[in-house]
């Protein structure tokens, strides 16, 4: 069976490496690995993509659950801060715009918001989607530098076709990342589901490096003189091209730079930074035992949070991958699909900060971190609290606190219930329990609560609500806490 597995590969270096991995697992697991390879064969994945799948399966079947013990870690301190970097890096950055590519992670569907298409195609106002803001920012820097900065959209199989149909920019590259079968934990075999789309998952954004290399795009960019890539999530519009960071990476001869920001108590889903064996280390929450989550959340011990924005020196990456593949720490992501327990075997691109020489973590302000993960975030982004600039950047000061019932969890429902958007006063608090249709643009001041237990949405025709709690029944709205201005 091992010979059959190795028959999928041609590279002598990969063959030698995989033989070592396969020697570490039993023949029973070889049978399971072969089943995954056969399932993936019709996709014609690159040799690197298949290699990554086999390595991940060998690690998982060998008992690697991706858990990183906190006992061997120490706080990450003394990182350079963007606000304290010399302004002369701006000049270097401006002179280096011709060497820059911008890469956006565009594989997400926004399933937490009920989306069935690319999250980047969600509207943030009637005229702009996330992708429009991204293109506006790239075009701004193209204009400033008079250079055709390449934009690369890393898509999953979920988002590739729809994104390509929605973006006509001539300097945009559409890169398809690998996909792998979901693993049925009951049998170790590939998942069999009622719909084929449910049987697959992207292997995490750590796949970026090998997808770039296997597609040939990495070498193409380097051959064109592109030496630096700025990479960020497409749902984080605060992650824009930054001259000082670009100039710093180049002037300090770094191969890899990760942007981290001071962690808040609300920063839980995502990665924290620490030190391991004298190197920066990325800790995704799923890589930490639940018994240690309370410690992980202590900002005194783990004060920095991963923004998932990185800067890469592309010739260094190309040189590394021409010698051997990267093996990033494993992430075991449990899911339930149609009642079946499965795992997705993934990696995170930020984990490369621990492996690559000349890598560094740079502390950036929260103004570079505004991920939109929920409809609460989307309400705020669509409001007056966030200034959307023509150059694709965003700015904000104080943000409101919003609590929503499940009726608002999906984007389509949100757009139906709040079609005109909401405006907020500084430090406003809004609680919505039950579906409320805001018939007009509404300004929220102070603490406002609207609730009802009716089966159908209730209309609200107010243009302003201030320090009030209202409850609706069949006869209409009733004030429980009067408006303080009355």
Feature annotation, model-predicted:
Residues 106-107, 234, 314, 375:
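Residues immediately flanking
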Residues 2-101, 247-486:
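Left-handed beta-helix
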């Amino acid at each position: 069976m091992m010979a059959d597995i190795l028959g999928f590969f041609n590279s002598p270096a990969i063959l030698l490496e995989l033989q070592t991995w396969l020697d570490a697992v039993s023949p029973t697991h070889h049978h399971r690995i072969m089943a995954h390879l056969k399932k993936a064969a019709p996709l014609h994945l690159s040799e690197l993509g298949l290699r990554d799948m086999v390595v991940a399966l060998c690690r998982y079947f060998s008992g690697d659950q991706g858990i990183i013990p906190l006992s061997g870690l120490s706080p990450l301190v003394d990182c350079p801060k963007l606000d304290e970097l010399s302004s002369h890096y701006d000049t270097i950055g401006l002179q280096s715009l011709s060497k820059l590519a911008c890469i956006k992670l565009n594989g997400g569907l926004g399933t937490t918001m009920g989306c069935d298409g690319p999250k980047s195609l969600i509207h943030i106002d009637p005229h702009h989607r996330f992708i429009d803001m991204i293109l506006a920012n790239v075009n701004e820097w193209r204009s400033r530098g008079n250079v055709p900065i390449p934009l690369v959209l890393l898509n999953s199989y979920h988002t590739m076709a729809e994104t390509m149909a929605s973006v006509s920019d001539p300097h945009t590259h559409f890169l398809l990342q690998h996909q792998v079968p979901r693993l049925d934990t009951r049998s170790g075999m590939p998942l069999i589901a009622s719909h084929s789309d449910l049987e697959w998952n992207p292997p995490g954004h750590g796949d970026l490096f090998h997808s770039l290399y296997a597609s040939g795009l990495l070498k193409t960019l380097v051959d064109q003189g592109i030496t630096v890539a700025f990479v960020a999530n497409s749902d984080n519009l605060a992650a824009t091209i930054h001259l000082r960071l670009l100039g710093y990476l180049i002037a300090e001869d770094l191969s890899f730079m990760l942007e981290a920001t001071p962690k808040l108590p609300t920063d839980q889903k995502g990665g924290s930074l620490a030190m391991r064996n004298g190197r920066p280390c990325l800790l995704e929450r799923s890589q930490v035992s639940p018994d240690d989550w309370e410690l992980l959340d202590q900002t005194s011990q783990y004060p920095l949070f991963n923004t998932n924005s990185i800067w890469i020196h592309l010739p260094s990456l190309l040189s590394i991958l021409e010698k051997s593949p990267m093996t990033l720490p494993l992430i075991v992501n449990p899911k339930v699909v149609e009642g079946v327990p499965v795992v997705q075997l993934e990696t995170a691109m930020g984990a490369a900060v621990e492996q690559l020489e000349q890598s560094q973590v740079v502390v950036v302000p929260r103004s570079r971190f505004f991920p939109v993960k929920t409809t609460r975030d989307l309400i705020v982004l669509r409001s007056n609290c966030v200034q959307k600039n023509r150059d694709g950047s965003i700015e904000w000061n104080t943000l409101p606190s919003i609590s929503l019932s499940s009726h608002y969890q999906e984007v389509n429902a949100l757009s139906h219930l709040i079609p005109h958007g909401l405006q907020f006063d500084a430090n406003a608090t809004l609680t919505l329990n039950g579906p409320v249709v805001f018939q007009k643009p509404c300004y929220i001041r102070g603490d406002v609560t609207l609730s009802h237990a009716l089966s159908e949405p209730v209309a609200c025709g107010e243009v302003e609500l201030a320090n009030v709690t209202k409850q609706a029944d069949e006869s209409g709205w009733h004030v429980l806490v009067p408006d303080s201005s009355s």
